[in-house]
Amino acid sequence: MELLLRFLLLCGVADFTRGLSITTPEQMIEKAKGETAYLPCKFTLGPEDQGPLDIEWLLSPADNQKVDQVIILYSGDKIYDDYYQDLKGRVHFTSNDLKSGDASINVTNLQLSDIGTYQCKVKKAPGVGNKKIQLTVLVKPSGIRCYVDGSEEIGNDFKLKCEPKEGSLPLRYEWQKLSDSQKLPTSWLPEMTSPVISVKNASAEYSGTYTCTVRNRVGSDQCLLRLDVVPPSNRAGTIAGAVIGTLLALVLIALIVFCCHKKRREEKYEKEVHHDIREDVPPPKSRTSTARSYIGSNHSSLGSMSPSNMEGYSKTQYNQVPSEDLERAPQSPTLPPAKVAAPNLSRMGAVPVMIPAQSKDGSIV
């Protein structure tokens, strides 16, 4: 009995003199991106721990390519939280009195770059203690898109797809029919790890509203899908319409090309004709040359007339400037009257008359 009491007393003294100790166990924490992670670090002090209290948090990045980074420090009754730029303004002590034995921190607005091992170090000479916490940041499923891949017609095969825009693996998929019996057809065998349901030989009873829920360890999201299985459409009419439309389009294009070509040919012909006319037409004569030609022709006519025939004509004034009448273009001569045959003249009562012949100088022969 006495030996037992001595053993218990020694154990109590050893525990009392153990000094500084961190009571928080090492652990792993999983949080979603954008949330706040609480990293605990609680400690106790011994009576011999009389030195200044120093608290330091370190981060060992997950890629193991960077050295340990100091993210927050308490020393000399002051807090320093601007050591690590990636966490600046996002890491804080949870307690206002760190000497009470709580060195826990909060990391807000978590990012994927925050993944790593966090180490809490507490020192109060001669006592020293440290603990490690593994932090994992996951992305919740979000931006889920549900759609049908294929033709929703009776007898056809198609697929129902459920695709998240983002989300950390592993992901699990759960399909459910909201209308009617709220059960999937027995022929469908969706896998929890596959985002696709293959539908074979679709029937009208497959129509309805479906929901797809995507989950991982930190959250979930879902989308709705409306499925309408309809009778097959008249494909022959559709194909015929497409062919006719294509032919009409080709005819229209050919007509436009023909009209454009014809218009270009007409414009080219007009330009060539206009150019030929301008080359063939001689330049117009001046008014002075016209007048001179007219005067010369008059002189020739007068010279050929006999003196007896010139009595009715006045003498030409050669010392005067030609009048405006001479400058005018000569008029075309009038045609002589049609000749009548002699027998016709006798029938008409004409009397034959003898006209004496004249020589070139005007004398009667």
UniProtKB/Swiss-Prot annotation:
<feature type="modified residue" description="Phosphoserine">
    <location>
        <position position="304"/>
    </location>
</feature>
<feature type="topological domain" description="Extracellular">
    <location>
        <begin position="20"/>
        <end position="238"/>
    </location>
</feature>
<dbReference type="GO" id="GO:0071253">
    <property type="term" value="F:connexin binding"/>
</dbReference>
<dbReference type="GO" id="GO:0001669">
    <property type="term" value="C:acrosomal vesicle"/>
</dbReference>
<dbReference type="GO" id="GO:0030165">
    <property type="term" value="F:PDZ domain binding"/>
</dbReference>
<keyword id="KW-0393">Immunoglobulin domain</keyword>
<feature type="domain" description="Ig-like C2-type 2">
    <location>
        <begin position="141"/>
        <end position="228"/>
    </location>
</feature>
<feature type="region of interest" description="Disordered">
    <location>
        <begin position="269"/>
        <end position="343"/>
    </location>
</feature>
<feature type="modified residue" description="Phosphoserine">
    <location>
        <position position="323"/>
    </location>
</feature>
<dbReference type="Pfam" id="PF07686">
    <property type="entry name" value="V-set"/>
</dbReference>
<keyword id="KW-0796">Tight junction</keyword>
<dbReference type="GO" id="GO:0016323">
    <property type="term" value="C:basolateral plasma membrane"/>
</dbReference>
<feature type="modified residue" description="Phosphoserine">
    <location>
        <position position="297"/>
    </location>
</feature>
<dbReference type="GO" id="GO:0045121">
    <property type="term" value="C:membrane raft"/>
</dbReference>
<comment type="function">
    <text>Component of the epithelial apical junction complex that may function as a homophilic cell adhesion molecule and is essential for tight junction integrity. Also involved in transepithelial migration of leukocytes through adhesive interactions with JAML a transmembrane protein of the plasma membrane of leukocytes. The interaction between both receptors also mediates the activation of gamma-delta T-cells, a subpopulation of T-cells residing in epithelia and involved in tissue homeostasis and repair.</text>
</comment>
<dbReference type="GO" id="GO:0086067">
    <property type="term" value="P:AV node cell to bundle of His cell communication"/>
</dbReference>
<feature type="modified residue" description="Phosphoserine">
    <location>
        <position position="306"/>
    </location>
</feature>
<feature type="modified residue" description="Phosphoserine">
    <location>
        <position position="363"/>
    </location>
</feature>
<dbReference type="GO" id="GO:0030175">
    <property type="term" value="C:filopodium"/>
</dbReference>
<dbReference type="Pfam" id="PF13927">
    <property type="entry name" value="Ig_3"/>
</dbReference>
<keyword id="KW-0965">Cell junction</keyword>
<keyword id="KW-0325">Glycoprotein</keyword>
<dbReference type="GO" id="GO:0005923">
    <property type="term" value="C:bicellular tight junction"/>
</dbReference>
<feature type="compositionally biased region" description="Basic and acidic residues">
    <location>
        <begin position="269"/>
        <end position="282"/>
    </location>
</feature>
<protein>
    <recommendedName>
        <fullName>Coxsackievirus and adenovirus receptor homolog</fullName>
    </recommendedName>
</protein>
<dbReference type="GO" id="GO:0030426">
    <property type="term" value="C:growth cone"/>
</dbReference>
<keyword id="KW-0449">Lipoprotein</keyword>
<dbReference type="InterPro" id="IPR052307">
    <property type="entry name" value="EJ_Adhesion_Regulator"/>
</dbReference>
<feature type="modified residue" description="Phosphoserine">
    <location>
        <position position="332"/>
    </location>
</feature>
<dbReference type="GO" id="GO:0030036">
    <property type="term" value="P:actin cytoskeleton organization"/>
</dbReference>
<feature type="short sequence motif" description="PDZ-binding">
    <location>
        <begin position="360"/>
        <end position="365"/>
    </location>
</feature>
<dbReference type="GO" id="GO:0016327">
    <property type="term" value="C:apicolateral plasma membrane"/>
</dbReference>
<comment type="subunit">
    <text>Monomer. May form homodimers. Interacts with LNX, MAGI1, DLG4, PRKCABP, TJP1 and CTNNB1. Interacts with MPDZ; recruits MPDZ to intercellular contact sites. Interacts with JAML (homodimeric form).</text>
</comment>
<keyword id="KW-0675">Receptor</keyword>
<keyword id="KW-0597">Phosphoprotein</keyword>
<dbReference type="GO" id="GO:0034109">
    <property type="term" value="P:homotypic cell-cell adhesion"/>
</dbReference>
<dbReference type="InterPro" id="IPR003599">
    <property type="entry name" value="Ig_sub"/>
</dbReference>
<keyword id="KW-0677">Repeat</keyword>
<keyword id="KW-0564">Palmitate</keyword>
<keyword id="KW-1015">Disulfide bond</keyword>
<feature type="domain" description="Ig-like C2-type 1">
    <location>
        <begin position="20"/>
        <end position="136"/>
    </location>
</feature>
<dbReference type="GO" id="GO:0005912">
    <property type="term" value="C:adherens junction"/>
</dbReference>
